[in-house]
A protein has these predicted regions:
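Structural transition elements
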Residues: 1-30, 51-56
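Short helix-initiation/N-cap motifs at beta->coil->alpha
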Residues: 52, 75-85
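Short alpha-helix C-terminal cap/hinge motif
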Residues: 60-75
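Short helix/loop segment immediately N-terminal to the Walker
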Residues: 30-43
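Detector for C-terminal structural segments
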Residues: 1-7, 53-62, 85-193
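Short, well-ordered beta-strand elements
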Residues: 41-50, 73-76, 93
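Short secondary-structure junction motifs
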Residues: 39-41, 70, 161-163
């Protein structure tokens, strides 16, 4: 492996900077499509674990939604048992949770949760084109084909699923010196809404 995946497959799935005007444009287009007005937007509930960190993150999201889009929200912090139960049963408007991407890539972990075969109220996503891209990536016979097919799955995911990456953390890997031809980055965990 030479270099990073991002160097080989350049793509910005989600812009790193906010575009309030574009967000307002999308909101207005959605309202027009539904035949609704901004006054008819309900108050949304933001479900999270009852930790101060989760509450603080959702307070920032709450402020951004109100300030930029005029959308009212309430924060519903719950014990881990209640939060997981509500998330798994689909009893939420927006859920703040986390997921590990795994190594060597996200195909066997995170992205598999969006295939039609993995239907649950937690994700509630089904798309035949996504399934086809995912299956091709999983069945790729070489690392080069797997990377190229993974990239197509990742692009489709970024462009078509309702998922908002709010931040990420990483961890380190250690390996014995003297190995050659070995490349590894840190494992990435991210939190999404």
């Amino acid at each position: 492996v030479n270099g990073t995946f991002d160097e080989e497959f350049e793509y910005e799935g989600w812009p790193a900077s906010a575009d309030v005007e574009k967000a307002q444009e999308y909101l207005n287009a959605a309202l027009d499509e539904l035949g609704k007005t901004a006054d008819e937007i309900p108050t949304f509930e933001l479900l999270c674990y009852e930790s101060q960190g989760s509450i603080d993150v959702l307070a920032a999201v709450q402020d951004m939604l109100k300030k930029n889009l005029g959308i009212e929200t309430t924060i519903n912090s719950q014990t881990i048992q209640v939060m997981v139960s509500n998330a798994m049963s689909g009893d939420y408007d927006f859920w703040y949770g986390g997921n590990s991407l795994e190594i060597p890539d996200a195909l066997t972990g995170f992205l598999s949760g969006y295939t039609s075969a993995m239907q649950s109220a937690l994700r509630g996503y089904s798309n035949e084109e996504y399934d086809k891209l995912y299956d091709e990536a999983i069945a790729s016979p070489t690392i080069e084909e797997r990377k190229a097919n993974y990239f197509e799955v990742e692009k489709f995911f970024c462009d078509n699923t309702l998922n908002l990456i709010l931040g990420w953390t990483d961890g380190g890997f250690q390996y014995k010196s003297g190995y050659t031809g070995f490349y590894n980055t840190t494992e990435t965990d991210f939190t999404y809404l």
